[in-house]
Amino acid sequence: MSKDLITGAEAMMRSLEHQGVTTIFGYPGGSIMPTFDALYDHQNTLNHILVRHEQGAAHAAQGYARVSGKVGVCLVTSGPGATNTITGIADAMIDSTPIVVIAGQVGTGFLGTDAFQEVDLVGITQPIAKWSYQIRRAEDVAWAIARAFYIASSGRPGPVVLDFAKNAQVEKTKYEPTQQEFIRSYVPVPDTDEESVKAAAELINNAERPLVLVGQGVELGSAQEELRIFIEKADMPAGCTLLGLSALPTDHPLNKGMLGMHGNLGPNINTNKCRLLIAVGMRFDDRVTGNLATYAKQAKVIHFDIDPAEVNKNVKVDIAVLGDCKKTLAAVTGLLKKNRHTEWVDSFKEYEAVEEEKVIRPELHPATDSLSMGEVVRAVSEATRHEAILVTDVGQNQMISARYFKYTRERSIVTSGGLGTMGFGLPAAIGATFGRPDRTVCVFMGDGGLQMNIQELGTIMEQKAPVKIICLNNNYLGNVRQWQAMFFNHRYSFTPMLNPDYMKIASAYDIPSKRVFSREELKVAIDEMLSTDGPFLLEACVVEEGNVLPMTPPGGSVNQMLLEC
């Protein structure tokens, strides 16, 4: 009988394998050592990526999940190891990213005694995770993992935290594979009301000036094709949120660009001119709506979403179509008449012309010798034939990349949208290379964000991860400086940056690099970067006080976008 028993740590490994896990991002330590010992015997099936900081593990798991559609996994120890993942957990929660964080914990006999590296991880993470649970017995491992993966990946995805007591790791138990399929108190996908489907279709069929707002929910629901058919049948222009940018190809004739504070003029201004606003898998966050008191007050609103909590949270809706958007979009489309809104669609051209003249042309073809941020981004996008996965950090690099990178394929943008986490980019890009090893991964970073998790260059070196790092170096914390210039009378309070030599740092990690100042150097360096097997760091020295435009001022309406500073 004893031969049939295995440790809780071994049960953890088998449970992860049963869930189809192949990649784990982690960092060992005292309270999780029995599990890492079990992992030693599973290296042929479970590829463990040793990060250099636990925050890096959480963000790498996010990057992996976002590009692959699978659940990302990270494995860390208790105390500081666990708390170092908190930012990644919060980031995953607000951006609906499915990850499972497994952290060691002191033995149950030591709980509540302030033991070495004891921290109440369940208590800390309950507000920022879909489910937090402490595994106290080895016999609970299999069902806890099954439930964790089910909750993380079903409905609106998100992070799950498992606090794995040390005694549960070493206790013996009988293992039986478990697959969670139902939890009575948890309804991940609400039932779709047929009446709401009919009402939505009727409103769309009779609408003048409809506008579709495309969110990340389209990609989370693998509904890109359903979205395309939906907008084409009714001839409806669309704008995409930051996280929804690759849900619709950039060059689709009905894709009118990005929504939000630094988005395109057309979809932003016409939000306040449309007669019907159709939100699909987006949550009306403040960066998209601007001043809610003036947002789309003239329009009827239809909201497609899988999460009932998002309906009427920020914007009052007339019709809520709840459920999986892949199914709900198809259901509504089946009731739509073929329509034409030629005059309405053409009205976007006026704003496109203004933006081209006032913003895009000066950014992509600057009059000065200095490189602009936008021309670097567009050059990389064109060199990859617009097929690369774009990962960004946070700051000006994020907004400029989102504006000037083009998207032709699904799941092609990975960025920290809701939490805005500087330091996200580098580890997320590592995760993306493991999630989609068949695709080129380019990460754009500022000189500020690059230094926040720069230790992950060690992970890139060890794994030979083919991350193409583009540092837009302007010697400033650029986004904060832009706000200081626009709203704080150019008082640059602690935003100028004295930077290290990034090429020397890259060399220390045995990563090829290039620093460029001119357009001629940029083209040569991009070609070298993309032809290099493995990682590469391209430092583009851009104009120091460049700004990301247009911009909705804080507290302003979406139709009050600024075209100059």
Which residue ranges define each predicted feature?
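Active-site nucleophile and cofactor-binding loops and adjacent substrate-binding regions
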Residues: Y27-G29, H48-H59, C74-G81, R136-A138, ...
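Generic enzyme active-site microenvironment
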Residues: V161, H303, V391, F444-M445
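Phosphate/pyrophosphate-binding active-site segments
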Residues: M1-K3, E139, Y175, K198, ...
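Conserved short loop/turn motifs at secondary-structure junctions
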Residues: G215-E219, H365, G446
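Short, internal active-site loops enriched in acidic
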Residues: K166-Q169, N397, E544
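Active-site diphosphate/adenylate-binding microenvironment
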Residues: A9-T22, G30, T35-Y40, E352-P427, ...
